Amino acid sequence: MHKLYDFIEARERLSTVITKTKLIHSSVFSKETGNDVYIKPENLQRTGSFKIRGAYNKIAKLTEEEKRKGVIASSAGNHAQGVALAAQKLGIKAVIVMPKYTPLIKVEATRQYGAEVILAGEEYDDAYNYARELQEKEGYVFIHPFNDDDVVEGQGTIALEVLEELPDADIILVPLGGGGLISGIALAAKLKNPVIKIIGVEPEGAASAIAALKNGDVVELPETNTIADGTAVRKIGELNFDYIKNYVDDIITISDYELMESFLLLVEKHKIVAENAGVLSVAALRKIKEKGKKIVSILSGGNIDVLTISSMINKGLVVRGRIFRFSVDLPDKPGQLVAVSQILSEQNANVIRLEHNQFKNLNRFHDVELQVTVETNGEEHINKITEEFSKRGYVIKRLNSQEIE
């Protein structure tokens, strides 16, 4: 097991490579939660995530013979870029195996760091297996994204930076996927301050660490279902499971809806754009029961494409009650659209879109459906709109965020 000086040496090893991301105090989340909240913005790290820390630390510690062989990794995201940049900095050949359908922007970003990219397999597991085959055939050193002590050591340097800036921090919230990030942070933080609490944050649809703890050993989930794709891991690392058992105080799960809302708040209040997995630790702030504590949320990465940003903002607005989308059945006769528009105007609801198709219901003696999207001021405003429609004899059905394009 690592000692404190191991993490200190790792920080020195990384000093010329990484960006020391400064804590950002959040008056917004502090006021909302009753705690003193800080954000550690690893989305501003080189390559856009914390992964460069573990990747560089691992590769830098290889023997000269291992370095001559080159390194190989499998990844569809941040680990690929971390390994590629680390290898480039150290003058080592890097091969990255990515699934065939990895977004082109991620493929090109990895190539720009000088790595050879091979597209293989439909899913990550296929790419992983092919990378292992190439490792055996060509003699490369495989760089695992989380189940590796040197990778864990590199990720733990985040805790040293946090406690250097905020030595009296009470709680650190950490996104939890495979377990590499939380393993390093938990051990390094506890070595510096044994009473600090480390809380992992998993998506509800990929809670592999909680499943392992309940089972008493690592277990593979049958599937994952979450928008936080960076933490959509079916099985945590066996090495990481030991760290979690011994050094992590609690694990919280977050729904996709909670992620959408927190994503919007980060963009709107802090002008911070983060990937969905990175937002987990921010979404978890509301689930902390303690008050008056100094809490640090590790925002683990910011590699997110523009289309996803747009979708997350729209869905976040729906979850926050800033956009209200509903359907209402109208008698199929003239003047109904005018009546609906009049109600919305009286309630100061700004109409974004109306979708009306009188041919949808071929039985002319029945109602037709109107779908309405309006801008609102929150849940109280939505309730007033709903009540007014009800008074006028209309029945409306609220549509959820999954139905927003």
Report residues per predicted region.
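PLP-dependent amino-acid enzyme catalytic core
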Residues: 1-405
